[in-house]
């Protein structure tokens, strides 16, 4: 049986793990990193690059380098949070035909799942290189507070990348699996505080030994899918823009190249200030005016950073209160606080979380790797490699339908253990009504319009009758991935309509199929480019070796032989500048043949 991989598809960084001899192992990428930047770059020669190579060229190619795409996945263009992001990123965010938030790169319109699929493809290839076998199945993590649309969009991304997503698992739950599996302790309740690059989650989880099984039961979850390290970076960037404008009278916010440099510098400074009290941000030639080039040189202290972001950390504590209330437990019942996500390395985050829970936070798991490790454990459970583990997760938000008067009527309450199925009987609002519209909603507001619309469908051919007489049975079936199937049935006639809820936007099957084909085509382009680079490098190495031999004073060689070799070198140097692989290989072989004579005569 082929391996099932565990992937943490993060806003800022992604990570991949697999069970090896029953133990989770984080897999290093081709650059030697244990995490991969969630960055996708589109180059001038129409190549797609992912991870560190994409991040490295972001400064010189800001409009075609995409990052923090996870913040757009499953969202509408008109959402306030998307509109806020438009002002902060150098790339172009647009509205698709159905109103979803997409991006435009080099005159091509791309859906967030399509871009996320490029990151997943890199993860897939990394795993295949490590395992030396084809990988087709994965467990992918999402923020616990992701709604149905965002979960479905993540599954779509996996499909485009050529992966069968066997399970979507909540990030804090995955971290709990990573933390609690090997710890042979008494039953305990933990709080997983997960502050990542773009999202925040808090989950209250009970770990118990039940009849020889380690049971992980999520008691409650809450969060904010638009709060994370990217927001901390933005605060630093805005402060740098403000300071520079005061000193130089120039506003850098309209300069995409300068903004990309500021972003990189802000992220670097933020990381440094977790271990030092002060750092310098030094960006020469950040811009220019009529008097010449301008340089940015600003000192930033840890206390200054803390004053800039303290309210963001406070914002994360409100969901913690709600999660405790929903779980019906007090702070003193929490045995351990687990920190997950790179932003939790910040000392002020650790202090404020510790103060809130009135307990010292745990720092004995790697916050960047725990989620991927947990995903690999869940993959092991699904494949039967890991036994005696039971995971009971919950739905983060209430699911219901719109009923008469524009009210949201819940069917599945938030924090209900999944998978689950709930059925409720409704009726018609008018006499002789022959059809009803089932409008599915997700959220906590009483007014239907104030909740997230997941989609609508009609149940037709209802037997005419006075209002209130027909019995329409509505069933909500929520699977282990947190994805919803809705069925409506006229109990008298047996007429039934059933759909898997996809948001009123989302990707159609045809769009997904086209994106899969596009991804496969790009994979061939990437392979060809990789072969070209390898071929060029081999030729370059041959040229270097032969040139070195020609300079050897002790070399005995005829003038015409030297001329032939030098001509071959010139030809090969010219061919290396092109992209004809066969010609490069042929000339390289010719040069090697000619140089063999040198070796024999030496």
Curated annotation (Swiss-Prot):
Keyword NAD: no
In-chain residues carrying the UniProt-annotated modification Phosphothreonine: 199
InterPro entries linked: ATPase_NBD, Chaperone_DnaK, Heat_shock_70_CS, HSP70_C_sf, HSP70_peptide-bd_sf, Hsp_70_fam
Keywords: ATP-binding, Chaperone, Nucleotide-binding, Phosphoprotein, Stress response
Keyword Nucleotide-binding attributed: yes
One Pfam assignment: HSP70
HAMAP family for the chain: DnaK
Function description: Acts as a chaperone.
Family: Belongs to the heat shock protein 70 family.
Protein name: Chaperone protein DnaK
Organism: Carsonella ruddii (strain PV)
């Amino acid at each position: 049986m082929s391996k099932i991989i565990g992937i943490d598809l993060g806003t800022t960084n992604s990570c991949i793990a697999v069970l090896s001899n029953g133990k989770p192992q984080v897999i290093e990428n081709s650059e030697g990193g244990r995490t991969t930047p969630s960055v996708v770059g589109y180059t001038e020669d129409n190549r797609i690059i992912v991870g560190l190579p994409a991040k490295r060229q972001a400064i010189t190619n800001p409009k075609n380098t995409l990052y923090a795409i996870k913040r757009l996945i499953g969202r509408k263009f008109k959402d306030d949070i998307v509109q806020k992001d438009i002002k902060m990123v150098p790339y172009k965010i647009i509205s698709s035909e159905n109103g979803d938030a997409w991006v435009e790169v080099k005159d091509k319109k791309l859906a967030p799942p399509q871009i996320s699929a490029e990151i997943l493809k890199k993860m897939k290839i990394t795993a295949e290189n490590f395992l030396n076998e084809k990988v087709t199945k994965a467990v992918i993590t999402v923020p616990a507070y992701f709604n149905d649309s965002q979960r479905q969009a993540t599954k779509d991304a996996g499909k485009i990348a050529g992966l069968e997503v066997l399970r979507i698992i909540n990030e804090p739950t995955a971290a709990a699996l990573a933390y609690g599996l090997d710890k042979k302790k008494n039953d305990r309740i933990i709080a997983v505080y997960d502050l990542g690059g773009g999202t925040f989650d808090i989950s209250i989880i009970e770990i118990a030994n039940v009849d020889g099984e380690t049971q992980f039961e999520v008691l409650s979850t809450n969060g904010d899918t638009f709060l994370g390290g990217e927001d901390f970076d933005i605060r630093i960037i805005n402060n740098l823009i403000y300071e520079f404008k005061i000193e130089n009278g120039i506003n850098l916010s309209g300069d995409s190249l300068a903004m990309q440099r500021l972003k990189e510098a802000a992220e670097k400074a933020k990381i440094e200030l977790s271990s030092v009290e002060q750092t310098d941000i030094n960006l020469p030639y950040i811009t220019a005016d009529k008097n010449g080039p301008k340089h940015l040189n600003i000192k930033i202290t840890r206390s200054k950073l803390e004053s800039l972001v303290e309210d963001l950390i406070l914002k994360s504590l409100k969901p913690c209160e709600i999660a405790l209330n929903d779980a019906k437990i007090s702070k003193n019942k929490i045995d351990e606080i687990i920190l997950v996500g790179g932003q939790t390395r910040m000392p002020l985050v650790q202090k404020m979380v510790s103060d809130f829970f009135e307990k010292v936070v745990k720092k004995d798991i790697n916050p960047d790797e725990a989620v991927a490790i947990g995903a690999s454990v869940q993959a092991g459970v699904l494949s039967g490699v890991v036994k005696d583990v039971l995971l009971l997760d919950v739905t983060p938000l209430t699911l219901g339908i719109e009923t008469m008067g524009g009210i949201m009527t819940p069917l599945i309450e938030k924090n209900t253990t999944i998978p689950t199925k709930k059925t409720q009987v409704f009726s018609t609002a008018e006499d002789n009504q022959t059809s009803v519209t089932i409008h599915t909603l997700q959220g906590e507001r009483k007014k239907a319009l104030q909740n997230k619309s997941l989609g609508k469908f009609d149940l037709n051919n209802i037997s005419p009758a006075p209002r209130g007489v027909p019995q329409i049975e509505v069933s909500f079936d929520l699977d282990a991935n947190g994805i919803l199937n809705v069925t409506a049935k006229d109990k008298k006639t047996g007429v039934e309509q059933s759909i898997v809820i996809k948001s009123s936007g989302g990707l159609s099957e045809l769009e997904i199929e086209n994106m899969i084909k596009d991804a496969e085509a790009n994979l061939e382009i990437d392979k060809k480019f990789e072969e070209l680079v390898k071929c060029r490098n081999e030729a370059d190495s041959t040229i270097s070796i032969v040139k070195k031999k020609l300079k050897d004073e002790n070399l005995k060689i005829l003038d015409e032989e030297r001329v032939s070799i030098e001509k071959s070198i010139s030809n090969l140097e010219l061919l290396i500048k092109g992209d004809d692989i066969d010609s490069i290989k042929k000339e390289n072989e010719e040069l090697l043949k000619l140089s063999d004579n040198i070796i024999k005569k030496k």
